[in-house]
C-alpha cells in the first residue's frame, strides 16, 4: 500500500517538473495544436464580436498580437510604451513614484521629446505636470492620459489591426481554442482529495504539459442529490471570474460517468494543513496578515462581480507553488442582482455569520465575518468559538456565534485584535467591510500598513512562506477514501440538456494564458512563420473574404475604451 502511494507521488512530481522544462509536452504536441489554414477562419472572422477591450486587452493572445501589430508602426508603438509606463508608475513604490513620474513626463510630454503623444490634449499634459510637482503625487496621475490613448487605439488602429496578418493569426488561435475537449486532452494522475460529488485528481494537458486539478462530479450522484443547479452555478461563476486570488476554470468536459471542471492546481496544500500540521498550531502575525491581504483582494474581486462566497474556512484556501493563496470551491457562491439581498442558511458550522444562522437577509456581510474567523484562526491556532480539538455540537456552536465574544491571547497584537473584533461584529450593519466603502475600508486598517495593495494585486510581493517543490501537501491515497456506488439512479436523455450546458470546452483567458506560459504560442508562431517573407504573409492575409461594411457600420462603429494593464509575459527558453 505504501508502495502504491510512493509511485503515485513520484509520477505526480515528475509531471509537475515537466511543465517548466517542456518535457511534459506530448511528442505529438505540434500535431495536437496544429493551426488551421487561414481560409478555414472566414466564418469566425464574420461572427466574432469586434469588441476592442475583449479582443485586444482581456484575451492574452489577442493582447500580445495587437501589441506586435502596434510595434510595426512608430506612432502606435509610442502609445503602447506610454501605457506600459503609466501602468508601471501605478505599482512603483511610493518613495520612487515622483521621480519615475517625472521621467515619464520628460519622455512623452516635453515639446522636444522624440516619442511625444499628439493625441493627448495640452490641458491634460499641464494637469500631469502640476500633479508631479507635489511631494507625493497621486497614484492616478496618468490615468486620464491613458484613457485618451485607449480610446485612440480602439478606433482607426483597431480597424487596421483587423486587416493585418496579426489578426489572422489571432483567428487561427481562436479556432484552435474552440475545438472540443475530451478526457483524451489530459493525462490523469493521483487523487488529491474529495469534493461533494466526486474526487479531485491531478491532471496534465498532453499538448502543453500544464498541470491542473480535475474536479469530477459524478453524474448519478448529482442527479440523486438534485445538484444540477449547484454544479452549473459553480461552473458559470468560475467561467466569468478572472482573479489571481480565486482558482481559475480552464476547461469543462464530460465523460460517460462524470462532469469535469479543470481548475488551477494548487500544489502548496490548504491553510488548514499549514495551520495545524507544521509545527505548533497557528502562524506568526506577519504571515497571517499577508494571507489576509490576499483574501481581502479575492473577496473584493468576487464582490465586484456581485458574488457572495459564503464558505470561507481554512480548507478552502489553497497555496500555489510560490506561496500565494487562492479561494477555492465556489459551490455555495451566489451572484446577487444589483439592489437585492438574499437569504440562505448555508456554510460550515463555526464559520457561518450570525445573520446566516438567524435566517436574515444579507449581501456580502457573511464573507467579511468569514475573513475575521480566518485571521483569528491563523493567529490563535484555533477558530474563534471553539478551542483546538474541542468537540462542540451544532446547536452549541451556533449559540456561541450569536451570543459570545471571542477571547484574545497574547499572540494577538493590538492591530490584530482590532481587525478581528471589527470583522467579528455581530451586527452586520456595523461590521468592517459592510458599509459603502466595502473592501477599501478593510484594506485601510492599520494591520495592513506594510502591504502595498497595488503591488500585491500585480503579483509583485513575495509571500512569507514558499512550499517545498518536492513535497506532496495532501493525504495519502488510501487515507482519502472512496465514494460508494450510487444505486437506483438512471440517466436519460433529459439529463443531456444539462450536460451540454456544463461541458463547453476551453475557457478563453486561462486557455490562452496556458498557451503563452507553456511556450507553445511562441514556438508554434515561429514554426508557422518559418521561411515566409513579409510579402507572402501579406498574401495570406489578403486571401480572406471580408464582409462589406455598410454606412451604419461606419457611422456607429464601436469605440470601446480599453483597460490595458501592463503585464510582462515571460516565456520558457528553448532547449
Swiss-Prot record:
Residue ranges of every copy of the AGC-kinase C-terminal domain listed in the record: 449-514
Major subcellular site: cytoplasm
A GO term, aspect molecular function: rhodopsin kinase activity
Keyword terms: Acetylation, ATP-binding, Cytoplasm, Kinase, Lipoprotein, Nucleotide-binding, Palmitate, Phosphoprotein, Serine/threonine-protein kinase, Transferase
The enzyme's E.C. designation: 2.7.11.16
Modified residues (N-acetylmethionine): 1
Active site: 311 (proton acceptor)
InterPro entries the record matches: AGC-kinase_C, GPCR_kinase, Kinase-like_dom_sf, Prot_kinase_dom, Protein_kinase_ATP_BS, RGS, RGS_sf, RGS_subdomain_2
Record: residues binding ATP: 192-200, 215
PTM: Palmitoylated.
One Pfam family in the UniProt entry: RGS
Limits of the Protein kinase domain: 186-448
Boundaries of every RGS domain copy: 51-171
Spans annotated as N-terminal: 1-153
PANTHER family: G PROTEIN-COUPLED RECEPTOR KINASE 4, G PROTEIN-COUPLED RECEPTOR KINASE/RIBOSOMAL PROTEIN S6 KINASE
Entry's family note: Belongs to the protein kinase superfamily. AGC Ser/Thr protein kinase family. GPRK subfamily.
Protein name per its UniProtKB record: G protein-coupled receptor kinase 4
Organism (species): Rattus norvegicus
Gene: Grk4
Amino acid at each position: 500500500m505504501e508502495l502504491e502511494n510512493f509511485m503515485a507521488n513520484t509520477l505526480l512530481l515528475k509531471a509537475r517538473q515537466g511543465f517548466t522544462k517542456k518535457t511534459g509536452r506530448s511528442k505529438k504536441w505540434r500535431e495536437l495544436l496544429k493551426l488551421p489554414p487561414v481560409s478555414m477562419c472566414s466564418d469566425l472572422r464574420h461572427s466574432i464580436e469586434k469588441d476592442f477591450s475583449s479582443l485586444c486587452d482581456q484575451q492574452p493572445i489577442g493582447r500580445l498580437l495587437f501589441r506586435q501589430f502596434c510595434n510595426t508602426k512608430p506612432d502606435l508603438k509610442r502609445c503602447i510604451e506610454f501605457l506600459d509606463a503609466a501602468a508601471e508608475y501605478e505599482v512603483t513604490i511610493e518613495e520612487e513614484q515622483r521621480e519615475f513620474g517625472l521621467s515619464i513626463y520628460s519622455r512623452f510630454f516635453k515639446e522636444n521629446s522624440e516619442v511625444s503623444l499628439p493625441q493627448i490634449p495640452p490641458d491634460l499634459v499641464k494637469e500631469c505636470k502640476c500633479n508631479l510637482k507635489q511631494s507625493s503625487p497621486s497614484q492616478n496621475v496618468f490615468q486620464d492620459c491613458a484613457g485618451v490613448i485607449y480610446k485612440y487605439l480602439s478606433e482607426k488602429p483597431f480597424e487596421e489591426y483587423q486587416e493585418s496578418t496579426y489578426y489572422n493569426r489571432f483567428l487561427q488561435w481562436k479556432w484552435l481554442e474552440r475545438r472540443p475537449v475530451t478526457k483524451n486532452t489530459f493525462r490523469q494522475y493521483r487523487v488529491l482529495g474529495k469534493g461533494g460529488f466526486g474526487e479531485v485528481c491531478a491532471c496534465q494537458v498532453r499538448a502543453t504539459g500544464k498541470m491542473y486539478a480535475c474536479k469530477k462530479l459524478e453524474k448519478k450522484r448529482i442527479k440523486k442529490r438534485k445538484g444540477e443547479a449547484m454544479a452549473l452555478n459553480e461552473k458559470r461563476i468560475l467561467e466569468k471570474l478572472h482573479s489571481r486570488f480565486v482558482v481559475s476554470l480552464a476547461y469543462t468536459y464530460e465523460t460517460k460517468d462524470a462532469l469535469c471542471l479543470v481548475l488551477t492546481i494548487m500544489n502548496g496544500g490548504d491553510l488548514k494543513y499549514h495551520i495545524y500540521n507544521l509545527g505548533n498550531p497557528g502562524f506568526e502575525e506577519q504571515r497571517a496578515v499577508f494571507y489576509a491581504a490576499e483574501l481581502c483582494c479575492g473577496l473584493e474581486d468576487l464582490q465586484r462581480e456581485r458574488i457572495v462566497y459564503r464558505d470561507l474556512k481554512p480548507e478552502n484556501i489553497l497555496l500555489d507553488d510560490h506561496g500565494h493563496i487562492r479561494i477555492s470551491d465556489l459551490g455555495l457562491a451566489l451572484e446577487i442582482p444589483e439592489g437585492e439581498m438574499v437569504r440562505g442558511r448555508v456554510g460550515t458550522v463555526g464559520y457561518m455569520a450570525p445573520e446566516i444562522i438567524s435566517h436574515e437577509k444579507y449581501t456580502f456581510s457573511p464573507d467579511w465575518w468569514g475573513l475575521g474567523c480566518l485571521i483569528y484562526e491563523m493567529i490563535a491556532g484555533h477558530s474563534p468559538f471553539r478551542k483546538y480539538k474541542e468537540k462542540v455540537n451544532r446547536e452549541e456552536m451556533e449559540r456561541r456565534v450569536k451570543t459570545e465574544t471571542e477571547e484574545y491571547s497574547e499572540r494577538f497584537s493590538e492591530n490584530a485584535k482590532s481587525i478581528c473584533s471589527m470583522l467579528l461584529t455581530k451586527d452586520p450593519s456595523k461590521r468592517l467591510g459592510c458599509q459603502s466603502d466595502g473592501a477599501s475600508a478593510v484594506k485601510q486598517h492599520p494591520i495592513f500598513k506594510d502591504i502595498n495593495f497595488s503591488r500585491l494585486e500585480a503579483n509583485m510581493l513575495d509571500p512569507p512562506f514558499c512550499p517545498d517543490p518536492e513535497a506532496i501537501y495532501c493525504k495519502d491515497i488510501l487515507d482519502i477514501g472512496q465514494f460508494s456506488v450510487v444505486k437506483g439512479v438512471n440517466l436519460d436523455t433529459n439529463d443531456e440538456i444539462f450536460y451540454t450546458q456544463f461541458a463547453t470546452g476551453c475557457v478563453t483567458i486561462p486557455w490562452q494564458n496556458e498557451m503563452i506560459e507553456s511556450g507553445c504560442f511562441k514556438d508554434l508562431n515561429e514554426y508557422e512563420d518559418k521561411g515566409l517573407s513579409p510579402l507572402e504573409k501579406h498574401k495570406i492575409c489578403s486571401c480572406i473574404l471580408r464582409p462589406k461594411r455598410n454606412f451604419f457600420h461606419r457611422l456607429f462603429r464601436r469605440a470601446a475604451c480599453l483597460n490595458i494593464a501592463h503585464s510582462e509575459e515571460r516565456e520558457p527558453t528553448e532547449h
